[in-house]
Design a protein with these regions (language model features):
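Short acidic-hydrophobic surface loop/beta-edge motif
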Residues: 8-12, 86-89
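Surface-exposed beta-loop interaction hotspot
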Residues: 13-78
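A mature extracytoplasmic/lumenal domain signature
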Residues: 32, 59, 101, 113-115, ...
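Extended, aromatic/histidine-rich regions of cofactor-dependent oxidoreductases associated
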Residues: 41-49, 116-117, 123, 129, ...
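Mid-length scaffold segments of soluble, non-membrane domains
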Residues: 77-120
């Protein structure tokens, strides 16, 4: 396969097939417009937006991306290139998150927090603003669930031990069921 082939889709009735690449692995994925999961889906649920969960963070870039081992929700393992980490203050305590950097310069965080026990999925994703003068903005109101929160057949990366925050962050997307 070539990178251009990854956008190819094939249709068969209500089914859509496409190639998904995760690291060096390829998978054939299928979407079914009439699946039970889709029919029973009642919509997304979010915490009310709260400006208190928008924080400035100090970004510390690595000299070169650091390959970090990541475990997937289905037990698979891969590595991801972490660009650096951010430190930030929440209610008087400091926290740290490692993140990847996308082509637009934004940082991408795979994290969880203590709300995973009651209200949120066990992993959430969050983008920051691109770093400017060593600072990024984290808006936890925009934290969202990965695909595996909705479909047990989807693989997703789990947070590294350092990205499992020992604080409740009641902001962003909740579990949908």
């Amino acid at each position: 396969l070539k990178p251009d082939d990854l956008d190819s889709r094939m249709f068969l009735g209500d089914l859509t097939f496409y190639i998904h690449q995760a690291g060096e692995r390829f998978a054939l994925r299928m979407k079914d417009k009439n699946s039970r999961l889709r029919q029973e889906f009642a919509g997304l649920r979010w915490y009310p937006i709260d400006p208190a969960w928008r924080v400035s963070a100090h970004f510390v870039p690595y000299l070169s991306p650091r390959e970090v081992p990541i475990e997937g929700i289905l037990g698979d393992r891969s590595t991801l290139p972490m660009a650096g980490y951010v430190t930030f203050d929440l209610h008087g305590s400091y926290y740290k998150l490692e993140g990847l950097q996308d082509d637009d310069g934004r940082l991408f965080f795979i994290f969880n927090d203590l709300t995973r026990k009651t209200d949120t999925y066990q992993v959430r994703f969050l983008f920051s603003t691109p770093p400017a003068n060593g600072t990024v903005e984290l808006d936890f109101n925009e934290a969202y669930n990965p695909p595996c929160a909705f479909n047990p057949y989807t693989t997703c990366p789990l947070p590294t031990p350092g990205n499992r925050l020992q604080v409740e962050i009641p902001a962003g997307e909740k579990r949908y069921h």
